[in-house]
Amino acid sequence: MKGTYREISILLPAYNNVCVPLVEELQRQAALLPGLQYEILVADDGSTCQEAIHQNRLIGQWPCCRYIERKQNTGRSAIRNFLAREARYGRMLFVDSDLHVCSPSFLKDYLEAEGDVVVGGILKGGDASRLASNLRYRYETDYQRKHDFSHRQQAEDKDFSAASFLATKQVMTICPFDENFKGYGYEDVLLGKSFSLHGFRIVHINNPLLMDKYEDNDTYLQKTQEACRTLYVFRTELRGYSKLISWQEKLQKHPWLYGLLRKSFPWASPWMRKWLTGNHPSVTLFNAYKLLYYIHLHEKDEAI
């Protein structure tokens, strides 16, 4: 896929968030590129927030924009596949609708990039002092230091993120999102693996979108547990693409320690949750919580 200014479909899945400013900026940048044929499609995936739906309807009144309301929530994979089918043009830019453009050349930089799949990355931001007690902010900023642009280039398929990436319609037809993923998490990890298995080159560029909104600690812990359950269901497919799986398999080789850890989550989790939802959440403790919960899922399954 060679860089070109000819055409692009910009695809945004939306759920319970207002993305009017994001679409406005994407449209502004697209309109400034000479000769570019473009469309911006926003698909609402059965949102329950009527205020978000009401505000986002404005998008449908803008040139080259469509706002599609879906009555039923179909999940993160299915809504993206729906957008890919609806897209008019051969090159498609997927953008999560809760992010922000932080570069005036964001769209231009994507269009000039070459590769079967191009990933721009995510920059974590926000007021550090105000967010000091936010678990996700702490985790994401710590994660960012270990997965910056240079690190992403070294592990192309294993550092794939669906929050912002460019691909052709042909690539997405061969490698669609797996719609068996109904819950939160890991659908993009498996997609990155699928790209690699089919021989598609994943190119990472330094063209991030900004993430600066973070859910409260309790909500994030609930989402984390949902992601762990998703990982457990698809553990065979995701082997080699998750550190949780790797750690669980390593610990399993030490029966005494593993047996202790398998039974520790029920009594350890209450005080861990209290600490993680408090004013001084620890990333180290959070990682331990995830591992214990993931191991606990094996214990529950084996007890049936």
Residue ranges and their predicted role:
Residues E226, K243-I304:
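Non-catalytic, C-terminal membrane-associated alpha-helical segments of glycosyltransferases
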Residues R70-A87:
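Glycine-rich, basic loop-to-helix element that forms the pyrophosphate-binding segment
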Residues G121, Y137-D157:
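Short, flexible, basic/aromatic active-site loop/helix in glycosyltransferases
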Residues M92:
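Short aromatic/hydrophobic "clamp" motif used to bind/position activated sugar donors
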Residues R201-R235:
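Active-site donor/metal-binding and catalytic loop motifs
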Residues P104-L135:
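Conserved donor NDP-sugar-binding/catalytic core segment of glycosyltransferases
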